[in-house]
Amino acid sequence: MGKRLLDKLWERHVVVTNENGLDLLYIDLHLVHEVTSPQAFEGLRLANRTVRRPELTFATMDHNIPTKDVWNITDRIAKQQLDTLRDNCKQFKVRLADIGDEEQGIVHVIGPELGLTQPGKTIVCGDSHTATHGAFGALAFGIGTSEVEHVLATQTLWQRKPKAMGIELKGKLPKGVYAKDIILHLLSKYGVAVGTGHVMEFYGETIRDMGMEERMTLCNMAIEGGAKAGIIAPDEKTFSYVKGREYAPKDYETFTGKWSELYTDSDAIYDLHISVDVTDLAPYVTWGTNPSMGVPIDEKLPEKHNENDERAFSYMGLSPGQSTFEIPVKHVFIGSCTNSRLSDLEIAASVVKGKKVKEGVRALVVPGSKSVRERAMQKGLHRIFEEAGFEWREPGCSMCLGMNPDQVPEGEHCASTSNRNFEGRQGKGARTHLVSPAMAAAAALYGHFVDIRKESYDGTISYS
């Protein structure tokens, strides 16, 4: 019987298997940020240990930093965490993308753009959305603080091998429909626990047509379906993306030969399999308090089926049977590790070019990294957004989570390109609606959701 991509990635990294069936995995890349690392570094200090492979460890500041004035950190805990990371990286000789550095940005944005993320690697980070890197054919997953310490100390991690779930995506995406809509559709149809105990492998015609940045969006949100990780077999698009980046292999041809072996064999069998045709897929909007509570833009909000639905409708201030077009959008956030890359900003800019944000709507564009921001500005995207009435910010996690100054006021609705819509995620009482960058941009213009498929834009942009 053939092997799945998961099998090949896993087997390449097993150091030893213990009597309980746990495998000790070697970790190729450890990404670190300011929130989940302080206790881990302190554990090393108390045990008189060092970081075993500092050259395989890379840190950045992203969760806590302000995006309007990055140096004006008024929150005491946030400042302490940032200062602590800076001190820890200096003491333990770990590379740090500090505030103001050209490499700084959201951890799951800078990993790929610096060439740190590569096919065949095992990648961990103290962050749920580490699965993003799986778009490159890497086995990437989030870990807890105690595990962060273990990896820092040993460059290994004890893990039980998950099952393999195949998700075949067939057909061509319609105009105005993106990877974000695919994953929201999957979550709406199959729920937040469908991938529990599995690694999701996305494959098929739709995947082959996708660029790397949309593939990252898919893998980023695999965790929202309960999966350990999301992965996609690397191809020529992957190799081309990695080639020439700062930390990419210099002997490129040697590595691409090895990377080309990373695919699921034709006779391999998944433990669980789903097939979805995206040909008639519509843009999605979430209405509730987890990412599976979503509907196509042209459908009404569903009936209440259980207590969770009852609570969600109450928290969101919405009702069954209500149209998505009736939801009042007061805030728009285009950013996060899900949708803050250059192609995301290009799509949003193509929607708003020459138009104006609706009066009373606060709209933020937060690039995922310094590099994304600079490249966007070279193309004039910042002018398009600012002329439309958006705020053009510095890179950071921003409004994705209520850990920095960018928050949504209680009781107000936000169209967000982030990945989670839990209660209080964007601030106390904030009401979050997950959408694609195109849908978020359009909502900023109207003050409510619209069907982007009916808007007069072609998904491309002229920089003249």
Curated annotation (Swiss-Prot):
Pathway per the UniProt entry: Amino-acid biosynthesis; L-leucine biosynthesis; L-leucine from 3-methyl-2-oxobutanoate: step 2/4
Catalyzed chemical reaction(s): (2R,3S)-3-isopropylmalate = (2S)-2-isopropylmalate
Lineage: Bacteria, Bacillati, Bacillota, Bacilli, Bacillales
Similarity section: Belongs to the aconitase/IPM isomerase family. LeuC type 1 subfamily.
This enzyme's EC code(s): 4.2.1.33
The protein's name: 3-isopropylmalate dehydratase large subunit
One Pfam family this sequence matches: Aconitase
Sorted UniProt keywords: 4Fe-4S, Amino-acid biosynthesis, Branched-chain amino acid biosynthesis, Iron, Iron-sulfur, Leucine biosynthesis, Lyase, Metal-binding
Required co-factors: [4Fe-4S] cluster
Organism of this sequence: Bacillus mycoides (strain KBAB4) (Bacillus weihenstephanensis)
GO MF terms held by the record: 3-isopropylmalate dehydratase activity; 4 iron, 4 sulfur cluster binding; metal ion binding
Organism superkingdom: Bacteria
Gene3D superfamilies xref list: Aconitase, domain 3
Record text on cofactor binding: Binds 1 [4Fe-4S] cluster per subunit.
Complex formation: Heterodimer of LeuC and LeuD.
Matches recorded under CDD domains: IPMI
The keyword 4Fe-4S is annotated on this UniProt entry: yes
